[in-house]
Amino acid sequence: MRGNGDMLARCWEERDLGALLAQRFGMFAMEELAEELERKYDDVIRLTLGQSELPVHPDITEAMVAAARDPRRSRLVYPLGVPALREAVADYETQASGRHVDPASVVVSAGSSTLIRNLCCLLAHDGGEVLLPRPYYPLYLYSAALAGARVNFYDIDLVTGCIDFASLREALNGDTRMVILNSPGNPLGNRLTMADLRQVDEAVDGRAVIVSDEIYRNMSFDDVAPSMGALNDPRSPIVVTNSFSAGLRMFARRVGYAVVPGELTPALTTLQAHTLLTTDPVPQYGAIEALRHLEEAEAIRMLYAGRRDYAVKRLGEVAGVRPIRAEGSFYLTIDVASRLGDGESDRTLAESILSAAHVATVPGSDFGLPGTLRLTYAASRFDEAIDRVAAFFEERV
């Protein structure tokens, strides 16, 4: 767990894939430490994985059980996804964007992570550049590295949650092949407006493909998070990715999708066929049922908005701790840079909190944001966990 908060970025800049792969994802390292502590104590609370503590809707479970028992459906092999799910997703995205989405443009995969990796391979395999938000979800960095792409960054303002468009325009260049957006974002929970999306498209101006990761789109707390797919007459090719893991709580079932321009579909189909072959049809039938229960996402959105409010208020009362108010997603980031001791990193601080308060958090250095911690709302004893974290800092000399 030791290491410099900028280690991932430094490994990338040095083009050292081996060193990059040697850097463990702090989230899973903290999960393992929490699991070890749970063997001794029964009061450990994990604020690590963005995996809702609420169960999957019973109708979704029943749909998967029925599909598993039906050999005609459980053995289906479709590299692009079961046709019925592609049609259901097209209807859903048509409603979300207000623009017709053809089922032929929908590519289903085992979660959206595999799609982002394959899109990096497809678009930037020749050493082209992938432009990422900073802070970033580490999947983006690793996907680009595995594709042999180069990485550049644009910044998200930590106070406003808005894109620093000057940094975006400065980072764009003739080698840029792909620009990744994430709204609401992970780890900040920042939300982009339609005006923001339009300004991104104008800045890119057709020079690269814009990939909009909208996995938390239905987890926007205070206002609607618009889809990039709703943009009228975009100048740039647009890919929208989404997943059933968050609001619809199919976290471990691994079903995601992308809506892609027609010219990318054949090549992406080939990549999917050779790197994945197929997505398990059983959870795909669960996903079809999930799209009939969108109220599930609304219920969890309201629950997590309340938890966000409590955490911002309670942690905001602690000297030297600054909650960065999230507008959506499953996560809240807190700035603790001024509370780090000499030689202490956010990783060692997270270990100390786990040891003393029995609350597992994720070091922000994993996301290119050293000096912070990421907390997930997805814990039934969330308020208690926040009180413990606050007490840890209040009692710390």
Model-found features: residue ranges?
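N-terminal small-domain helix-loop-helix segment of the aminotransferase-like
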Residues: 2-111, 118, 396-397
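Generic structural signal for small/hydrophobic residues in well-ordered secondary structure
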Residues: 30, 47, 64, 89, ...
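Short beta-strand
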Residues: 44-46, 322-327, 365-366
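PLP-dependent aminotransferase class I/II
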Residues: 57, 237-328
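Conserved core of the PLP fold type I
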Residues: 69, 73-202, 218-232, 239, ...
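PLP-dependent enzyme catalytic core of the Aspartate aminotransferase-like
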Residues: 91, 169, 342-344, 351-361, ...
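Residue-level recognition of strand-loop junctions within catalytic nucleotide-signaling folds
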Residues: 261-262, 292, 335-337, 378-380
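Conserved PLP-binding catalytic core of the aspartate aminotransferase-like
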Residues: 304-305, 320-356, 373, 379
